[in-house]
Each structure stands twice: as C-alpha cells, then as structure tokens.
From Swiss-Prot:
<dbReference type="GO" id="GO:0043571">
    <property type="term" value="P:maintenance of CRISPR repeat elements"/>
</dbReference>
<dbReference type="InterPro" id="IPR002729">
    <property type="entry name" value="CRISPR-assoc_Cas1"/>
</dbReference>
<keyword id="KW-0051">Antiviral defense</keyword>
<comment type="function">
    <text>CRISPR (clustered regularly interspaced short palindromic repeat), is an adaptive immune system that provides protection against mobile genetic elements (viruses, transposable elements and conjugative plasmids). CRISPR clusters contain spacers, sequences complementary to antecedent mobile elements, and target invading nucleic acids. CRISPR clusters are transcribed and processed into CRISPR RNA (crRNA). Acts as a dsDNA endonuclease. Involved in the integration of spacer DNA into the CRISPR cassette.</text>
</comment>
<dbReference type="InterPro" id="IPR050646">
    <property type="entry name" value="Cas1"/>
</dbReference>
<dbReference type="GO" id="GO:0051607">
    <property type="term" value="P:defense response to virus"/>
</dbReference>
<feature type="binding site">
    <location>
        <position position="234"/>
    </location>
    <ligand>
        <name>Mn(2+)</name>
    </ligand>
</feature>
<dbReference type="InterPro" id="IPR042211">
    <property type="entry name" value="CRISPR-assoc_Cas1_N"/>
</dbReference>
<keyword id="KW-0460">Magnesium</keyword>
<feature type="binding site">
    <location>
        <position position="166"/>
    </location>
    <ligand>
        <name>Mn(2+)</name>
    </ligand>
</feature>
<comment type="similarity">
    <text>Belongs to the CRISPR-associated endonuclease Cas1 family.</text>
</comment>
<dbReference type="GO" id="GO:0046872">
    <property type="term" value="F:metal ion binding"/>
</dbReference>
<dbReference type="GO" id="GO:0003677">
    <property type="term" value="F:DNA binding"/>
</dbReference>
<keyword id="KW-0479">Metal-binding</keyword>
<dbReference type="InterPro" id="IPR042206">
    <property type="entry name" value="CRISPR-assoc_Cas1_C"/>
</dbReference>
<protein>
    <recommendedName>
        <fullName>CRISPR-associated endonuclease Cas1 1</fullName>
        <ecNumber>3.1.-.-</ecNumber>
    </recommendedName>
</protein>
<dbReference type="GO" id="GO:0004520">
    <property type="term" value="F:DNA endonuclease activity"/>
</dbReference>
C-alpha cells in the first residue's frame, strides 16, 4: 500500500502559495522561500493569514490534494478538494448503518474500546519508563478503572451507556495524566482537560495535535470512499467530521498524547513558547507550532507492526489501514471492525 505521508503545514503569517510547474511555491513579500513537488503531498494545511492562488487550488483539486484552512491557533475554517472519491454503494451502506441503532452502538463501542485500551497502555508505559518519577499507586488504580470500563463495554448495547463509560474512562485517565509529565517545570502541570479555549500549555498542545490528526484521518477516510461526516460515536452536526472524530479516539493516546508528553519531558517545548491572553486562553507561538508539527511529521514516518494485519507500516499509514478495515466491515467483507490497540 503506497501512500504519500507528507502534509504541508504552512504557519508563517503572510505566506502566499502558488503553482509553478508541478510544484507549490511558497513566497513571503514576493520573495520565494521554498518549493515542494505537489506529487509528494497528500494535503496542504494553512494556518491563519496564508493565501493560495486559484491556479494552485484548481491543480490540487485535480491531483486529489486537499487544501485546509485553519485559524492561526488551529480552529478549522474550511477545506477545498476536488470531486469526492469512492463508491456510492459504500456510502449508502455507511448511511444505512449509521441510521441503525444496534449497528451504530456496535461501532461506537469498538471505537471506545480502542480509545480506552490505548490510554491504558500509555499509563503502563509511563509507569514502566519512569518508575522513580511517577506515583505508581495512582497509575495502577487508573489502569484498573480503565480495565473495568473495557469489561463493561463488552456487553454494552445502549449508545448513551457507551458514551457514559467513555466519559468515566476519560476522567480516570486525565486524573493521572500529570503523573506522566516528568519535566520539573511547573508551567506544564496538568489539572484536567480544557478546550475552546485551552487554559494551560498542556491542553494547548493536546488540542493542536488532535487537530492535525483529525485532518489526516479525514483525508484517509475520504481516500477509502467513506463519508467523514457520517459517524457512529459522535452525533451528526453540520460541519462536524463525526466519523473522523470517531476514528481519532483510537489514536488520541497512542500518537497525540505520547507525542505531547515526549516534547515536554525532553525539554523540546518551553514555557516561553506560549502566549496567555487576559481571559486565560493559552496559544502557542510560531516556534512551538513548528516544533510540534516537525515532531508529528517525524512520528508519522516511524514504523510499527499493525496488531491486526500483522504487517509493518509507517505510523502515518495506520489511519489509512483502519479506514480500509472500516470500509470492509461496512461492505460486509469482514465480520467485525478491529479497532487499533497498541500492544
């Protein structure tokens, strides 16, 4: 399976993207900064005051390269892409499944099992790697709660019950997340999840990396012919990529949380890399965004053996593989969708 894993993230304010030959040309104040072959990209993400020429947008549409626009701090604005790929029969099957209560509950349960399973492994890794810097009792207790949530999910058929168990697991996980942060800087203490806006540096990093992952997962779903807006765990809402958010749950901890923990614990992100507004909202400065994006791209190039398929692949291909497995399940080619659980 050959997929281009490169997403071009443009964060420098005032950048202008244009087409020159088969390359995307990035200029600032009419001065060329770099050029990148378009055939090497699977997406372009523009943050803040970044503009694109109509010719570039048209060519990207022809090549199937989605161009996404976000605010400077990562809030989704819009996405431009060419004709939707995929089999209409697959999408019809997806919509029928999303309208079926029992089938929706089944998939919602599997997404949550994947999420909690990976969260449990993240806590176990923190205890194993840093036993002298963590409260082992707290981490073990949280792992026990998560294991209990997974057992209860095995028999859960009610959608609201499934979401309730997910919330219980998230509360237990984030109640000890601060134990996974081994850096001594008090600026990176974590007291709980906050969003829209994030109210501390750790939440700011988490929200931003989740945004990057959502973009890539959305593209993977579309490349497999699925509609990223028709989800099972997350309810329909205009403009919300519910299915992309469903699949994101499997990868929040394994990719997003561990990446943020690594950057903090290794001292690659510093307290001075953030701005705090009068309202308490926290936002990354440009250097911090670039550091996180670079680390994210590097993480996507690392290899892992897929626990279900049994083949080695780049981390950045995991959501493509999960999207393919989900499409096969919806078509009836396999009996059950196997959520990704890191072992």
């Amino acid at each position: 399976m050959k997929k281009h894993l490169n997403t071009l993230f443009v964060t420098t304010q005032g950048s202008y993207l244009s087409k020159e030959g088969e390359c995307v040309l990035i200029s600032i104040d009419r001065v060329e900064k770099t050029r990148i072959p378009l055939h090497m990209l699977n997406g372009i993400v523009c943050f803040g005051q970044v503009s694109c020429s109509p010719f570039l947008l048209g060519h990207c549409a022809q090549l199937g390269v989605a161009v996404t626009f976000l605010t400077e701090h990562g809030r989704f604005l819009c996405q431009m892409q060419g004709p939707v790929k995929g089999n209409i029969l697959l999408r019809r099957a997806q919509y029928r499944m999303a309208d079926n209560y029992d089938q929706t509950a089944t998939l919602a349960r599997l997404f949550v099992i994947g999420k909690i399973g990976n969260a449990r492994v993240t806590l176990a890794r923190a205890l194993r790697d840093h036993p002298e810097k963590t409260d082992g009792e707290k981490l073990k207790n949280a792992q026990h709660v998560l294991a209990g949530c997974i057992r209860r999910l095995q028999e859960a058929t009610d959608q609201e019950l499934i979401r309730g168990i997910e919330g219980e697991a998230a509360k237990a996980y984030f109640s000890v997340f601060d134990e996974c942060i081994t850096a001594d800087d008090p600026a990176f203490r974590f007291e709980g999840r906050s969003r829209r806006p994030p109210l501390d540096r750790v939440n700011c990093l988490l929200s931003f990396v989740y945004t990057l992952m959502t973009h890539d997962i959305r593209s993977a779903l579309e490349s497999c012919g699925l509609d990223p807006a028709a989800g099972f765990l997350h309810k329909d809402r205009p403009g919300r990529p519910s299915l992309a958010l469903d699949m994101l749950e499997e990868f929040r901890s394994y990719i997003g949380d561990r990446l943020v923990l690594s950057l903090i614990n290794r001292g690659q992100i510093h307290a001075k890399d953030f701005d705090i507004s009068e309202t308490g909202a926290v936002a990354m400065k440009d250097d911090a965004r670039k550091t996180l994006i670079t680390a994210y791209q590097q993480r996507k190039q690392e290899e892992i053996e897929h626990p279900f398929v049994g083949e080695k692949m780049a981390v950045g291909l995991l959501w493509h593989m999960q999207a393919m497995l989900l499409a096969r399940y919806i078509r009836g080619d396999i009996d059950m969708y196997p959520p990704f659980v890191w072992r």
